[in-house]
């Protein structure tokens, strides 16, 4: 099954927690990474089947738009990332995310 990665980046913490919550509720995806991108900018990444990641990112973007004062910085969905990308960048499933893998 083709696996994708989707990432949303926002200004501030409240919109990213809203996005993360909406993403895992809307689709069969697993949060693989969350963190501080730079000054007050946060990101969340999910993995799962391509169509599920697309659905999750759409739901996350909607949640950001509905969060008062939220600012979307950027987002992306990458279907079937190359093995080299998975190996070098921290987008793969981790020991923490594996129990929640769909």
Swiss-Prot record:
Gene3D superfamilies: 3.30.70.1710. Heterologous expression of 12 carboxysomal genes in E.coli (ccaA, ccmK2, ccmK3, ccmK4, ccmL, ccmM, ccmN, ccmO, ccmP, rbcL, rbcS, rbcX) leads to the formation of bodies that resemble carboxysomes, have densely packed paracrystalline arrays and RuBisCO activity. These structures open the door to generating carboxysomes in plant cells to increase their photosynthesis and productivity, as well as tailoring bacterial microcompartments to specific metabolic needs and molecule delivery. The absence of ccaA, ccmK3, ccmK4, ccmP and rbcX leads to less active RuBisCO. InterPro entries: BMC_dom (IPR000249), BMC_shell (IPR050575), CcmK (IPR046380), CcmK-like_sf (IPR037233), CcmK/CsoS1_BMC (IPR044872). Transmembrane segments: none annotated. It is found in: Carboxysome. One of its GO terms (biological process) is photosynthesis. Induction: Carboxysome size and components vary with growth conditions. When grown in ambient air at medium light (50 uE meter(-2) second(-1)) there are 15 units of this protein per carboxysome, the numbers are stable under low light and high light, and increase under high CO(2) (at protein level). The CcmK3:CcmK4 ratio of 1:3.8 is stable over all growth conditions. Keywords: Bacterial microcompartment, Carbon dioxide fixation, Carboxysome, Photosynthesis. GO terms for cellular component: carboxysome. The keyword Nucleotide-binding does not apply. Disruption phenotype: Single deletion has a wild-type phenotype, a double ccmK3-ccmK4 deletion has slightly larger, aggregated instead of spatially separated carboxysomes, and has a photosynthetic affinity for inorganic carbon between wild-type and carboxysome-less strains. In another study single mutant is wild-type, double ccmK3-ccmK4 mutant has impaired growth rate; ccmK3 does not complement the double deletion, while ccmK4 does. Its main location: other. The keyword Zinc does not apply. Residues 4-90 form the BMC domain. One of its GO terms (molecular function) is structural constituent of carboxysome shell. Belongs to the bacterial microcompartments protein family. CcmK subfamily. A non-essential, minor shell protein of the carboxysome, a polyhedral inclusion where RuBisCO (ribulose bisphosphate carboxylase, rbcL-rbcS) is sequestered. Hexamers form sheets that form the facets of the polyhedral carboxysome. In PCC 7942 there are several CcmK paralogs with presumably functional differences. This subunit probably only makes heterohexamers with CcmK4. The CcmK3-CcmK4 heterohexmers have been suggested to cap other hexamers, perhaps to alter metabolite flux. Interacts stably with CcmK4, probably forms heterohexamers with a 1:2 CcmK3:CcmK4 stoichiometry. Bulky residues in the pore region probably preclude the formation of homohexamers by this subunit. This is Carboxysome shell protein CcmK3. It comes from Synechococcus elongatus (strain ATCC 33912 / PCC 7942 / FACHB-805) (Anacystis nidulans R2).
């Amino acid at each position: 099954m083709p696996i994708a990665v989707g990432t949303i980046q926002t200004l501030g913490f409240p919109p990213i927690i809203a996005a993360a919550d909406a993403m895992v509720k809307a689709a069969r995806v697993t949060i693989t990474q969350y963190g501080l991108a730079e000054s007050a900018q946060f990101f969340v990444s999910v993995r799962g089947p391509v169509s599920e990641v697309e659905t999750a990112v759409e739901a996350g973007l909607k949640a950001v738009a509905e969060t008062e004062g939220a600012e979307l910085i950027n987002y992306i969905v990458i279907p079937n990332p190359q093995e080299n990308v998975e190996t070098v960048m921290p987008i793969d499933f981790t020991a923490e995310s594996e129990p929640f893998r769909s």
